[in-house]
From Swiss-Prot:
Keywords per UniProt: Cilium biogenesis/degradation, Coiled coil, Cytoplasm, Cytoskeleton, Repeat, WD repeat
UniProt-listed Pfam families: WD40
Family as reported in the entry's similarity comment: Belongs to the WD repeat POC1 family.
InterPro entries: G-protein_beta_WD-40_rep, WD40/YVTN_repeat-like_dom_sf, WD40_repeat_CS, WD40_repeat_dom_sf, WD40_rpt, WDR55_POC1
Coiled-coil regions listed: 431-463
WD repeat residue numbers: 16-55, 58-97, 100-139, 142-181, 184-223, 226-265, 268-307
Subcellular localization(s) per the UniProt record: Cytoplasm, Cytoskeleton, Microtubule organizing center, Centrosome, Centriole
Gene Ontology BP terms: centriole replication; cilium assembly; epithelial cilium movement involved in determination of left/right asymmetry; heart development; optokinetic behavior; renal system process; retina homeostasis; retina layer formation
Gene3D superfamilies listed in its UniProt record: YVTN repeat-like/Quinoprotein amine dehydrogenase (2.130.10.10)
CDD domains in UniProt: WD40 (cd00200)
Domain of life where this protein originates: Eukaryota
Organism (species): Danio rerio (Zebrafish)
Protein name, as recorded: POC1 centriolar protein homolog B
The protein's role, per its UniProt record: Plays an important role in centriole assembly and/or stability and ciliogenesis. Involved in early steps of centriole duplication, as well as in the later steps of centriole length control.
Length: 490
C-alpha cells in the first residue's frame, strides 16, 4: 500500500432525487449511503456494483437530517414536518414515526450505543429520545433562536448544539445542564460535531468560517476561513487528522488538521454544497447539494497513518472521564486562509456508467407507545419525473411493468413484493387518509391555542371583577367617612 498521499478521486455519482440534497450518511457496514432531499424522500444507495437503490416516502415536507444507527439496522430521518422517522434500510421499507417538536426538526443523531436520539429544532429546543420506545427523555432549552444541529459526543456523555443565536453550546447528558457556551460568530452557526476522540468540537458558520475548540481548555485552537461563502456542513475523518467541508461557494475543501492547512479544493457540484460525510472506515466520502446529485469520492489518504490510529481507538477501554484521546494541533488559534500550494481538483463526470435502478418502497408503522408523539400520516407514493422514458430514469408505471415481468428474478434471495401491493390499499385512499389526519392535527393544535386564549381571557376577566369589587368597597368606605366627618344635620 502506498505511503504517499494521492489526490482524492470521484468514484461514482448517483441521480435519483428530484430536488436539493440536504443530508447524507454512510451505513457503518460501508455498504449503503443514505441521502435526504427537499423532494421529501429518503434514498438508500447500495454501494455494490449494479445494486438497486431504494426510495422511501413518508415525510410530508423537506428532509433535513439523516443518520444510521451504529448497528446499521436503522436509519433515522428528521423533517420540516416536525417528525422523526426510523426506517429499516431494506426492500421492506418499514418505518415508525413520532412527532418530535412543534416546529421544523433540523437534525437527528444516534448515540454511540444506539439507545438514544438527539434532535434539534426551530422551536429553539434540543430533545433527547429513547430509541426502543420512541419515548421523550428530556429537553435542553437555553438557545434563544433556531437550533440547526445537535450531536452526541463519542462516549455519549456530552451533546453539542449550535444555532441562529450565534452560539455553540455544550451540554452534560447526566445533569442536563449547559456547561459551556462558545460565542465567536459573525452569523449563524450552521453545523457542529465532535472529533473522533471527543477532545474537540468543530463548528461552521454563515460567516464562511470553521472553528475548532478544545473542550478541555475551552480554547479556540484552529480557525479556518478558506471558503468564499457560508459553510453549510463538514465531517471529521475517522482518524481525526482531516476535515472536509461543503459551502455555498460550490466547493468542497479538505483540511489537514495536523499541519493546520488547506490541502485540496474539490469542484464537482453546480450550486451550494449542503452535505458532506465520511464513511466509517474513512476510505470514502459523499457530497450533495443544490444540483440534486450525490457524488461519492475516494479519499486516497495515507492509509498507513490513519488505519493504525483507528485500530488503537477501537481497542481502547476508557474508564477515565472524557476526553481521552489525541489532541488536535496546532494549539494556536490563528486563522488559516487559502494558500497557493493547495491542489484544486475538477473531476470529469462519468457518463458511461448508468445510475442504479430505483425501487420505491415505504411502509409506516405508527408509534403507539406515546400518544402525544403520534403524527398519523401514512406513506404515499412519489412519482418519477415524467418524460424520461429511457435509461436509468423510468416512470412509476414503467418501473412497475418491468418489475412484474422480472419478479421472480429480481426478488430472489428473500425479497418480496412492495408493501403497497401486499396491503392492497389504493394510493388515492392512502393520500386522502393522510390529508384527513393532517387536517385533524391542525384542528387539534387550533383548539389547543383557542383553549389557552380562553383561559387567559377568563383570568383577565376574573381579575377585572376582583378589582371592581375592591373599587366598590373603597367607594363605600369613602362615602361613610364623608358622612361621619359632616356630622348630624342641624
Amino acid at each position: 500500500m502506498a505511503s504517499v498521499m494521492e489526490d482524492p478521486t470521484l468514484e461514482r455519482h448517483f441521480k435519483g432525487h428530484k430536488d436539493v440534497i440536504s443530508c447524507a450518511d454512510f451505513n457503518p457496514n460501508n455498504k449503503q449511503l443514505a441521502t435526504g432531499s427537499c423532494d421529501k424522500s429518503l434514498m438508500i444507495w447500495n454501494l455494490a456494483p449494479k445494486a438497486r437503490a431504494f426510495r422511501f416516502v413518508g415525510h410530508t415536507d423537506v428532509i433535513t437530517g439523516v443518520n444510521f444507527a451504529p448497528s446499521g439496522s436503522l436509519v433515522a430521518s428528521s423533517s420540516r414536518d416536525q417528525t422523526v422517522r426510523l426506517w429499516t434500510p431494506s426492500i421492506k421499507g418499514e418505518s415508525t414515526v413520532f412527532k418530535a417538536h412543534t416546529a421544523s426538526v433540523r437534525s437527528v443523531h444516534f448515540s454511540r450505543d444506539g439507545q438514544r436520539l438527539v434532535t434539534a429544532s426551530d422551536d429553539k429546543s434540543v430533545k433527547v429520545w429513547g430509541v426502543e420506545r420512541k419515548k421523550f427523555l428530556y429537553s435542553l432549552n437555553r438557545h434563544t433562536n433556531w437550533v440547526r444541529c445537535a450531536r452526541f459526543s463519542p462516549d455519549g456523555r456530552l451533546i453539542a448544539s449550535c444555532g441562529d443565536d450565534r452560539t455553540v453550546r455544550l451540554w452534560d447528558t447526566s445533569s442536563h445542564q449547559c456547561i459551556n457556551i462558545f460565542t465567536d460568530y459573525g452569523g449563524s452557526a450552521t453545523f457542529v460535531d465532535f472529533n473522533s476522540s471527543g477532545t474537540c468540537i468543530a463548528s461552521s458558520g454563515a460567516d464562511n468560517t470553521i472553528k475548532i475548540w478544545d473542550i478541555r481548555t475551552n480554547k479556540l485552537i484552529q480557525h479556518y476561513k478558506v471558503h468564499n461563502a457560508g459553510v453549510n456542513c463538514f465531517s471529521f475523518h475517522p482518524s481525526g487528522n482531516y476535515l472536509i467541508s461543503g459551502s455555498s461557494d460550490s466547493t468542497i475543501k479538505i483540511l489537514d488538521l495536523l499541519e493546520g492547512r488547506l490541502i485540496y479544493t474539490l469542484h464537482g457540484h453546480k450550486g451550494p454544497v449542503l452535505t458532506v460525510t465520511f464513511s466509517r472506515d474513512g476510505d470514502l466520502f459523499a457530497s450533495g447539494g443544490a444540483d440534486s446529485q450525490v457524488l461519492m469520492w475516494k479519499t486516497n489518504f495515507d492509509s498507513l497513518n490513519y488505519r493504525e490510529l483507528l485500530s488503537k481507538h477501537s481497542k481502547r477501554v476508557t474508564p477515565d472521564p472524557p476526553p481521552h484521546l489525541m489532541d488536535i494541533y496546532p494549539r494556536s488559534h490563528h486563522r488559516h486562509h487559502p494558500q497557493n500550494g493547495t491542489v484544486e481538483i475538477n473531476p470529469v463526470a462519468d457518463t458511461q456508467s448508468t445510475d442504479p435502478q430505483v425501487v420505491e418502497v415505504g411502509r409506516v408503522v405508527f408509534s403507539t407507545t406515546d400518544a402525544r408523539n403520534y403524527d398519523g400520516a401514512s406513506s404515499s407514493r412519489a412519482q418519477f419525473t415524467s418524460g424520461m422514458d429511457s435509461g436509468p430514469f423510468r416512470t412509476h408505471t414503467q418501473a412497475r411493468e418491468e418489475e412484474d415481468e422480472n419478479q421472480e428474478e429480481r426478488f430472489a434471495g428473500g425479497m418480496t413484493a412492495s408493501p403497497a401491493e401486499r396491503s392492497g390499499i389504493p394510493s388515492s385512499l392512502t393520500s386522502t387518509l393522510e390529508n384527513i389526519v393532517q387536517q385533524l392535527d391542525i384542528l387539534t393544535q387550533t383548539v389547543a391555542v383557542l383553549e389557552e386564549r380562553l383561559t387567559l381571557t377568563e383570568d383577565k376577566l376574573r381579575t377585572c371583577l376582583d378589582n371592581q369589587v375592591l373599587l366598590m368597597q373603597q367607594n363605600q368606605q369613602l362615602d361613610r367617612s364623608d358622612e361621619e366627618s359632616e356630622g348630624p344635620p342641624l
